[in-house]
């Protein structure tokens, strides 16, 4: 699908790569690379680091206009469509609206990275409005996500989608290691994973006490961040109040059809995109004895979502460059990716497997991590699926 003809650097049929139950995937290099972050930055054209408020905001306006167009069509024309065509119409609306709102979510994510404009205050205002409208506590997630970028690939300090060792996985996991179990696990993860992460830190790094993105005094945040966590909570309260008023005026069924189901699709895409960016049989994780920031930042995979690459503002197919240079705006990210690929060589990871096939494969093969038996270092961990 899509991908502009890019070749995958991870797929191979070389039988010498039979490790960890992934004979069809070539492992990424895990030793220190022969290049530096400075080498990569010098390869990127300087204009790729320029952030234009006008250009960035044009994408916000475009997404909002499309979202309003879909809303107008649904509310003005769908009541006159008889069943069963009305069911088809609503399914199309939910899918289209969910995809557009996912793209809008991505722009809010860029605001949190200061990749929207040269003005931090403008970035935070736009990000707060956009993410609050999608029931995301903007500042709370901005700070936890920043720590994810600072510690990516570390088994001890990464913030989210931290794989467990075989000895620490849940006792019931092996009973879900079958097709029905994987369907159940994927459904629960896609539908509930994002709100459970925000509210209960599910799939997040362990803390010594209860961690929650809505708690200004929780262990995720520092004292200087608390005021902004309150502001993020106020944003969620404001959106919840608007939804309450809409429910009183139009009914819960109307709110769910117009807003609730598209938001659920946003949450599903968000979990799937994030999961596939950081989960792959061919990429390592590092213990404290091996981890360093540059190698950790390369523990990510660019994926192909076809036409949705543009709808999602290239968040999925330029994610390697994003973890190396998070302030590059999305409209320069593809150019930056093309610039660093020749230098990175096999350290750059791209997998063109259709995302629905990749999701099933990763759910099957990436269950826990362990170091290779007899390896010279025990600080490099690889995904396994054999209990």
Curated annotation (Swiss-Prot):
<keyword id="KW-0443">Lipid metabolism</keyword>
<keyword id="KW-0444">Lipid biosynthesis</keyword>
<dbReference type="GO" id="GO:0006633">
    <property type="term" value="P:fatty acid biosynthetic process"/>
</dbReference>
<keyword id="KW-0492">Microsome</keyword>
<feature type="short sequence motif" description="Histidine box-2">
    <location>
        <begin position="145"/>
        <end position="149"/>
    </location>
</feature>
<keyword id="KW-0560">Oxidoreductase</keyword>
<feature type="transmembrane region" description="Helical">
    <location>
        <begin position="253"/>
        <end position="273"/>
    </location>
</feature>
<dbReference type="InterPro" id="IPR005804">
    <property type="entry name" value="FA_desaturase_dom"/>
</dbReference>
<comment type="similarity">
    <text>Belongs to the fatty acid desaturase type 1 family.</text>
</comment>
<feature type="short sequence motif" description="Histidine box-1">
    <location>
        <begin position="109"/>
        <end position="113"/>
    </location>
</feature>
<protein>
    <recommendedName>
        <fullName>Oleoyl-12-hydroxylase FAH12</fullName>
        <ecNumber>1.14.18.4</ecNumber>
    </recommendedName>
</protein>
<dbReference type="GO" id="GO:0016717">
    <property type="term" value="F:oxidoreductase activity, acting on paired donors, with oxidation of a pair of donors resulting in the reduction of molecular oxygen to two molecules of water"/>
</dbReference>
<feature type="transmembrane region" description="Helical">
    <location>
        <begin position="183"/>
        <end position="203"/>
    </location>
</feature>
<feature type="transmembrane region" description="Helical">
    <location>
        <begin position="229"/>
        <end position="249"/>
    </location>
</feature>
<feature type="transmembrane region" description="Helical">
    <location>
        <begin position="88"/>
        <end position="108"/>
    </location>
</feature>
<comment type="pathway">
    <text>Lipid metabolism; monounsaturated fatty acid biosynthesis.</text>
</comment>
<keyword id="KW-1133">Transmembrane helix</keyword>
<dbReference type="GO" id="GO:0050183">
    <property type="term" value="F:phosphatidylcholine 12-monooxygenase activity"/>
</dbReference>
<dbReference type="InterPro" id="IPR021863">
    <property type="entry name" value="FAS_N"/>
</dbReference>
<keyword id="KW-0472">Membrane</keyword>
<dbReference type="GO" id="GO:0005789">
    <property type="term" value="C:endoplasmic reticulum membrane"/>
</dbReference>
<dbReference type="Pfam" id="PF00487">
    <property type="entry name" value="FA_desaturase"/>
</dbReference>
<keyword id="KW-0275">Fatty acid biosynthesis</keyword>
<keyword id="KW-0276">Fatty acid metabolism</keyword>
<feature type="region of interest" description="Disordered">
    <location>
        <begin position="1"/>
        <end position="34"/>
    </location>
</feature>
<feature type="transmembrane region" description="Helical">
    <location>
        <begin position="61"/>
        <end position="81"/>
    </location>
</feature>
<comment type="function">
    <text>Oleoyl-12-hydroxylase involved in the biosynthesis of ricinoleate (12-hydroxy-cis-9-octadecenoate), the major fatty acid constituent of the oil seeds from castor bean plants. Catalyzes the hydroxylation at the 12-position of 1-acyl-2-oleoyl-sn-glycero-3-phosphocholine (2-oleoyl-PC), which seems to be the actual physiological subtrate. It uses cytochrome b5 as an electron donor. May also be involved in the production of lesquerolic acid (14-hydroxyeicos-cis-ll-enoic acid) in vitro.</text>
</comment>
<dbReference type="Pfam" id="PF11960">
    <property type="entry name" value="DUF3474"/>
</dbReference>
<keyword id="KW-0812">Transmembrane</keyword>
<dbReference type="InterPro" id="IPR012171">
    <property type="entry name" value="Fatty_acid_desaturase"/>
</dbReference>
<keyword id="KW-0256">Endoplasmic reticulum</keyword>
<keyword id="KW-0503">Monooxygenase</keyword>
<dbReference type="GO" id="GO:0016491">
    <property type="term" value="F:oxidoreductase activity"/>
</dbReference>
<feature type="transmembrane region" description="Helical">
    <location>
        <begin position="121"/>
        <end position="141"/>
    </location>
</feature>
<feature type="short sequence motif" description="Histidine box-3">
    <location>
        <begin position="319"/>
        <end position="323"/>
    </location>
</feature>
<dbReference type="GO" id="GO:0004497">
    <property type="term" value="F:monooxygenase activity"/>
</dbReference>
């Amino acid at each position: 699908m899509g991908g502009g003809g890019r070749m995958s650097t991870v797929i191979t049929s070389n039988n010498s790569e039979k490790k960890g139950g992934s004979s069809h995937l070539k492992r990424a290099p895990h030793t220190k690379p022969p290049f530096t972050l400075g080498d990569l930055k010098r390869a990127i054209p300087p204009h790729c680091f320029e952030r234009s408020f006008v250009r960035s905001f044009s994408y916000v306006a475009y997404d909002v206009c499309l979202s309003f167009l879909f809303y107008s069509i649904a509310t003005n024309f769908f009541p006159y469509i008889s069943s069963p065509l009305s069911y088809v119409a609503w399914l199309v609306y939910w899918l289209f609206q969910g995809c557009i709102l996912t793209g809008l979510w991505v722009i809010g994510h860029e605001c949190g990275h200061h990749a929207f404009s040269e003005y931090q205050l403008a970035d935070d205002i736009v990000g707060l409005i956009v993410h609050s409208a999608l029931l995301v506590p903007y500042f709370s997630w901005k700070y936890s996500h920043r720590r994810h970028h600072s510690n990516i690939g570390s088994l001890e300090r990464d913030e989210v989608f931290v794989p467990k060792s075989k000895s620490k996985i849940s006792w019931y996991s092996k009973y879900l290691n079958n097709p029905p179990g994987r369907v159940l696990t994927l459904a629960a993860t896609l539908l509930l994973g994002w709100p459970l992460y925000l509210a209960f830190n599910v799939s997040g790094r362990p803390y010594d006490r209860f961690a929650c993105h809505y708690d200004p005094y929780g262990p995720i945040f520092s004292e200087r961040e608390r005021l902004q966590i309150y502001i993020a909570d106020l944003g969620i309260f404001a959106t919840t109040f608007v939804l309450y008023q809409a429910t009183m005026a139009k009914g819960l069924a109307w709110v769910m059809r117009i807003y609730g189901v598209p938001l659920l699709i946003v949450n599903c895409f968000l979990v799937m995109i994030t999961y596939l960016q950081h989960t792959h049989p061919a990429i390592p994780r590092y213990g404290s004895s091996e981890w360093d920031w540059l190698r950790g930042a390369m523990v990510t995979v660019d994926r192909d979502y076809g036409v949705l690459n543009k709808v999602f503002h290239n968040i999925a197919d330029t994610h390697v460059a994003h973890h190396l240079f998070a302030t590059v705006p999305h409209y320069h990210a593809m150019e930056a990716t093309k610039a660093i690929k020749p230098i990175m060589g096999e350290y750059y990871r791209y997998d063109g497997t259709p995302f629905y096939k990749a999701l099933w494969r990763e759910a099957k093969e990436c269950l826990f991590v362990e170091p290779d038996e007899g390896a010279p270092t025990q600080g490099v961990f690889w995904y396994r699926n054999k209990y």
